Amino acid sequence: MRGVFVDANESLAVIFEGLQKDGDPEVRINRNPDITPEQYPEILDGAEIAIVDHTALPTDIAKKCAGLKHVVFLGTRARSYMNPEELAETGIHVHLL
């Protein structure tokens, strides 16, 4: 299983890199915090896990992300950025961190 931190600013990227350990799933860090929702399919490139700091993930865009199964949202107000129930209906599970 592999993931992508889709919208990391430099500070979050450095922190995330420091937390990675041997045996963790492969996670690529996209160091562009200014992505648009339409860029998700290209940035994820088939990854099963999207780690999201602040970029909206509309359900219609999520459906275009081949292989996406899990969204890890860094915050407590995921509903402001995505619809967890709609995503679950498509087989994509939202997790809060």
Predicted regions and their residues:
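Phosphate/diphosphate ligand-binding glycine-rich loop within oxidoreductases
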Residues: 48-97
